[in-house]
Amino acid sequence: MENFKHLPEPFRIRVIEPVKRTTREYREKAILNAGMNPFLLDSEDVFIDLLTDSGTGAITQEMQAAMFRGDEAYSGSRSYHALARAVKDIFGYEYTIPTHQGRGAEQIYIPVLIKKREKEKGLDRSKMVALSNYFFDTTQGHTQINCCVAKNVYTEEAFDTGVKADFKGNFDLEKLEQAILEAGPANVPYIVSTITCNSAGGQPVSIANLKAVYEIAQRYDIPVIMDSARFAENAYFIQQRERDYRNWSIEEITREAYKYADGLAMSAKKDAMVQMGGLLCFKDESFFDVYTECRTLCVVQEGFPTYGGLEGGAMERLAVGLYDGMRQDWLAYRINQVEYLVNGLEAIGVICQQAGGHAAFVDAGKLLPHIPADQFPAHALACELYKVAGIRAVEIGSLLLGRDPATGKQHPCPAELLRLTIPRATYTQTHMDFIIEAFEKVKANARNVKGLEFTYEPPVLRHFTARLKEKA
């Protein structure tokens, strides 16, 4: 089947959810009532939902069947042990704590690592800096509410939509070491390797880069946590683009990559394909003290550490989903679907970030050059796209990045992107064609799209619940 121009979806659709069609007038009223924030729309008013791929896709029949094996014991559940075995087999990590989702893991490990650094290295809490190739929004939020600065050290080409590169998600290694020295190694409680790098456009990180980051971290005795939401997509890109690993399986690449971290935090709602679930895992006995403290904190914040806020059936489903998300044919289809959408958008003159793993990222700054960054061009584009076609997408730009907690000033954003996030096994090529046609209509009226200003601005993670209005 290799000689066909386009292969169809490698699955059969057995259950469907009807969606309603709405009028332009209806959608204009809906987005206005939502405070010009697509997050606040009701899902029944959305025709194609590209807000996120987090827990919004279909699951496999094997995952559904696994739920019936659930052991709902409060402690010592056999479903927990099934999940822990899967983690050890796939990642090589000894210690597993389930959580309700990724941010559940973050709210546990971040304060524990800060406390450990303070106790062992004399960390100065007034000078704390955590580093990443690019923090996911909730990771940044949890870092900041623990009074730690979140600093991103990405490469120069990462946000340049005019540049093609194999691994645009990589750390800038020189900037990483410079940032460590500027803060003082004792004041860096952790480094987060985000794979794939969501905010840069779902761009992958090479094993060579992960290894180099880990070597730098070990030099200064700084723990590395792998933000693992899209670990399988990252492994697929490594297989396709990093010469040394072209003949390796996804499973082999994954095991190799996770040698270069001390722990992992995962929103399992992405590559593990579940609707709800997360993981916090540590590699070996060198982090047993951290694991022990995290288990204690888990009881307070998530639940007993052998269920972590998940029912037994959900842990069984997650154990299967970790494997199902690594299937070669599945990953090839998923990455090709994103590439098809990006190519279609660029064919009509809509500039995008290089095709990445889970979404097409439209360069809203170039599509709406008349809207300045402080009026959130990508968010304005999201509102216009909804008005035109009922498509919900999400801004990855100045609105998401937020303000400097110390000064209150808007953080400078390297790019104003609109993320069209594709849920797993949910939308077909016909949907992609509809999205492309919708952008043709948006592009024709682009000069009339207005910037936005706040009517309500939350202090943290403002993009989720902010309310805005169009500038006069």
Curated annotation (Swiss-Prot):
Pfam families: Beta_elim_lyase. It comes from the Bacteria. It is an enzyme of class 4 (lyase). One of its GO terms (molecular function) is tryptophanase activity. Its EC number is 4.1.99.1. It catalyses: L-tryptophan + H2O = indole + pyruvate + NH4(+). Disulfide bonds: none annotated. Its cofactor is pyridoxal 5'-phosphate. Keywords: Lyase, Pyridoxal phosphate, Tryptophan catabolism. The modification N6-(pyridoxal phosphate)lysine is found at K270. Pathway: Amino-acid degradation; L-tryptophan degradation via pyruvate pathway; indole and pyruvate from L-tryptophan: step 1/1. Homotetramer. Belongs to the beta-eliminating lyase family. HAMAP family: Tryptophanase (MF_00544). This is Tryptophanase. The lineage of its organism: Bacteria, Pseudomonadati, Pseudomonadota, Gammaproteobacteria, Vibrionales. The gene is tnaA.
